[in-house]
Design a protein with these regions (language model features):
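Interfacial aromatic-anchored transmembrane helix boundaries in multi-pass membrane proteins
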Residues: 28-45, 70-105, 139-141
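Membrane-interface helix caps of multi-pass small-molecule transporters
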Residues: 33, 100, 104, 108, ...
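Internal alpha-helical transmembrane segments of multi-pass membrane proteins
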Residues: 107-129, 185
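Hydrophobic transmembrane alpha-helices
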Residues: 2-58, 62-63
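Hydrophobic alpha-helical transmembrane segments
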Residues: 18-23, 50, 54, 65-69, ...
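Mid-bilayer segments of alpha-helical transmembrane spans in multi-pass integral membrane proteins
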Residues: 96, 100, 124-137, 163
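Alpha-helical transmembrane segments and their cytosolic interface
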Residues: 2-25, 109, 113, 146-185
């Protein structure tokens, strides 16, 4: 293939990734509206996490990181939710980690559908660990408390419905992208 066509191919992929990333960012803004402002429902399904995880799989770690980092702050500017400190700030780091990990793990794991699940689960664990570290640092800076039981409750116990929901939804969407041919094996 001549160099010109390789450049066009790369440019087309960059444009597609940018457009998809914009769509995923928009989904981060509007999906929480399905909770009707209920923080209990929002915490139960964590709707902002889904587009970021999918963005990492579909567009790559760089795009996933950017969408994850921007989404909580942009959502706060538009809807005044989530509260910017400490929730939104910790969430930005968590979502950026989701985007980075899902993108990197999808790239290095075999492209069989069954490997989407370990990539997703490891990404979710890594993002939650990042969230805990950031919350711990912010608590120390703010003179408040954040201990291991608060971490386990916030990252896992209270998040069980969201974890299950993400394990069901995210792989289905990633497999749909694969089926369309956008994600190459």
């Amino acid at each position: 293939m001549p160099l010109y066509f390789e450049r066009i191919e790369k440019m087309n992929k960059t444009i597609k990734n940018t457009v998809f990333s914009a769509m995923f960012l928009a989904l981060c803004l509007v999906l929480p509206l399905i909770t009707f402002g209920s923080t209990q429902i929002g915490n139960a399904i964590s709707p902002m996490h889904i587009p970021v995880l999918i963005c990492g799989f579909v567009c790559g770690w760089q795009y996933g990181a950017i969408v994850g980092l921007i989404a909580p702050f942009l959502r706060y500017l538009i809807f005044h939710m989530p509260p910017i400190y400490p929730i939104g700030t910790a969430m930005a780091f968590e979502l950026a980690a989701y985007g980075i990990l899902s993108g990197i793990l999808y790239k290095i794991f075999p492209k069989k559908n069954k490997f989407i699940y370990p990539a997703l689960i490891i990404s979710m664990l890594g993002g939650r660990i990042v969230w805990g570290i950031v919350r711990y640092i912010m608590a120390g800076l703010g003179g408040s408390e954040f201990n291991i039981s608060m971490f386990v409750a916030g990252a896992f116990t209270n998040a069980i419905p969201a974890i299950i929901f993400h394990i069901v939804i995210v792989p289905l969407v990633v497999m749909a992208f694969k089926k369309t041919g956008y994600l190459k094996d």
